[in-house]
Amino acid sequence: MRNPQNSDKKVINTARPLILVGLFILFFVQVSAQNGTINFSGNWVLNESKSKFGDSPFRMAASILIVKQEGNNLSTERTQNSPDGQEMKTTGKFTMDGKECENSGFMDSKTKSTVKWSADNKSITIASSTIFNMNGDNMEMKASETWMLEGDKALKIETTNSMPDGELKTTLVYDKK
């Protein structure tokens, strides 16, 4: 006569490795998602009709944004026009692990930034601080940019710039070339 207890033990012993493999796969997928499955790389062109520029008398938004994301590194090249109409290019190099990075800013300043992933790994926030000299006075500008993809064809950047004389919020939408 068959002992049902022995049969149950065999099923459990057979299922245990399958359960462990399943848990390993689940863990691997979770870790992969946390390591940046979202990739912001691309050549992006400003979509002015979908963007909101706030109350600024001139637009300080890049018309072209080139982004390269490789592993934990993010680099940007922004092309925009200065208030006097001259084309300006600025570059930035960041790590996406929350460590502080330093890049050249405007008016011979230095910008210190950190990049952090959101809890759901669907967006990043770049928090920056720039100290510059204007007419003999040191001023600090703080900025926060939250990047998120809308599908794979649009990059939305919500920005808040804070200076002693006020705050400016913009929403920039870029279409992928």
Give, region by region, the residue ranges found by the protein language model.
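Bacterial N-terminal signal peptides that target proteins for export
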Residues: 2-19
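Bacterial N-terminal signal peptides
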Residues: 18-29
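Hydrophobic small-molecule pocket/channel-lining residues, especially in calycin-type beta-barrels
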Residues: 34-177
